[in-house]
From Swiss-Prot:
Assembly description: Monomer.
Species of provenance: Pseudomonas putida (strain GB-1)
InterPro entries associated with the record: DNA_glyclase/AP_lyase_DNA-bd (IPR015886), DNA_glyclase_Znf_dom_DNA_BS (IPR015887), Formamido-pyr_DNA_Glyclase (IPR020629), FPG_cat (IPR012319), MutM-like_N-ter (IPR035937), Ribosomal_uS13-like_H2TH (IPR010979), Znf_DNA_glyclase/AP_lyase (IPR000214), Znf_FPG/IleRS (IPR010663)
Name recorded for this polypeptide: Formamidopyrimidine-DNA glycosylase
CDD domains: EcFpg-like_N
Length: 270
């Protein structure tokens, strides 16, 4: 599933080609995504100029002069720029044609993504209750410490809760916990303030590094420019269960936490 760095990579790839451009037509070949694409999307968006492309959590917000297209890539979706008129292949559900001669094409083999229209996106039900962005000053270790008090759940699903902080998905939660030396199974409410301060720093560092590397290519992800991400080469623990730790050589262990695989080093993480 594309996580925050992959979505931010997509935003950075498509924004320069969309902002300031006028939409000439929207072609929807299949409306059956996680939620049906609005039947009047072509009418609402065609003829409008795109003002900006923003990201909130893992949602892309394509802001037009009036209204916003809210897009989510789901489990296997991607948005990329192609030449106008390029024939569509299987699973290529939507084309947003631009007067510049390019079009933004949405591909989603599993159809778990979304394309919705809103006149007030930040108050849309999908975005209204989201926590702070992890790379802003609104997120820090003190927030983690305060929100964790009295919580008996494991620390990994705690930091993956979008009400706590957005965009810390499975890959980056796994890597940040390793970097902070925290066992992902530890009870969230039992971790000290000092360790949460360290964890918040590592969450920011890991996410920033992943964005600079263009995200992590695992199975389906490609960026808005059609290029893969390279952060997979930097992974210390994610997807490496049973292999030796790159720091101490101890065999990494894999457990299930919140229905997700979690890999950790029993020596480096306490």
């Amino acid at each position: 599933m594309p996580e925050l760095p992959e979505v931010e990579t997509t935003r950075r790839g498509i924004a320069p080609h969309l902002e300031g451009q006028r939409v000439s037509r929207v072609v929807v070949r299949d409306r059956r995504l996680r939620w049906p694409i609005p039947e009047d999307l072509d009418v609402r968006l065609s003829g409008q100029r795109i003002v900006s492309v923003e990201r909130r959590a893992k949602y892309l917000l394509i802001n037009a002069e009036v209204g916003t297209l809210i897009s989510h890539l789901g489990m296997s979706g991607n948005l990329r720029l192609v030449e106008l008129g390029l024939p569509a292949a299987k699973h290529e559900h939507v084309d947003i044609e631009l007067e510049s001669g390019l079009m933004l094409r949405y591909t989603d083999p599993r159809r778990f993504g979304a394309m919705l229209w809103s006149l007030d996106p930040l108050n849309h039900e999908l975005l209204l209750r989201l926590g702070p962005e992890p790379l802003t000053d609104l997120f820090d270790g003190e927030r983690l410490f305060q929100l964790s008090r009295g919580r008996s759940m494991a620390v990994k699903p705690f930091i993956m809760d979008n009400a706590v902080v957005v965009g810390v998905g499975n890959i980056y939660a796994t890597e940040a916990l390793f970097a902070a030396g925290i066992d992902p199974r530890r009870e969230a409410g039992g971790i000290s303030r000092a360790r949460y301060l360290k964890l918040a720093i590592e969450i920011k560092r890991v996410l920033a590094a992943a964005i600079e590397q263009g995200g992590t290519t695992l199975r389906d992800f490609i960026g808005g420019d059609g290029q893969p991400g390279y952060f997979q080469q930097e992974l210390f623990v994610y997807g490496r269960g049973g292999q030796p730790c790159k720091v101490c050589g101890t065999a990494l262990r894999e457990v299930k936490l919140g229905q997700r695989a979690s890999v950790y080093c029993p020596r480096c993480q306490r």
